Amino acid sequence: MLFVINLFFYHFWLLALGITGLNVLIMRLWAQKFITAQPELAEGYRQLFWGMLFYLGLPWLVMGFGIVVGGVPAPLYFLDPKTGNPFVLTFHLTLVFLWLLGFMWIYFWDGAEFYVKYITPLRRSSILTRSPLGVKIMAAISFGAGLIGLVTLWLFDFPGPGF
């Protein structure tokens, strides 16, 4: 049983990458009715799905590279950037890069409008994400929460396996 648990944790990044791909595939299937009704939306949805694979998949690929090639023993080690492990630091820099990219997209590159046009119809969205201003408010909350989480990882010591 311990072997199965260790195998799961060692390959967690691969499972997360697979779930990311599955989510994108499901959203693509949901979008098909919108593309059929309005074929001019096809290019925007294509950009959306490739963007999602990049934005949501890159951190898991970086983590997997660190585990398989870099000798990081398990995904839990990525919660302790203070170790100075270059693969763990690269993972955290990747997150910061993606947050900056997401921030620029939402606030300066019409990402909020794109979100309302392409993503809001795919899901039962909250009232906030039905307008570009609401998307920007939700993005600010999300970016703020992520920043608090990242700073917490750098400032506090968390006991755990291998720490």
Pin down the residues of each PLM region.
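N-terminal signal-anchor/start-transfer transmembrane helix
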Residues: I5-T36
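Long, highly hydrophobic alpha-helical transmembrane signal-anchor segments
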Residues: M1-F3, R46-F91
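Juxtamembrane boundary at the C-terminal end of a transmembrane helix
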Residues: L147-F163
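Short, strongly hydrophobic alpha-helical membrane anchors
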Residues: M1-F8, P161-F163
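Short alpha-helical packing/oligomerization segments
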Residues: Y10, L79-Y118
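Hydrophobic alpha-helical transmembrane segments of multipass integral membrane proteins
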Residues: L17-V24, W60-L61, L93-L100, M104, ...
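Loop-to-transmembrane boundary segments
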Residues: G44-L58, S125-L147
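Cytoplasmic membrane-interface regions of multi-pass membrane proteins
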Residues: L25-G44, A74-L76, Y107-R130
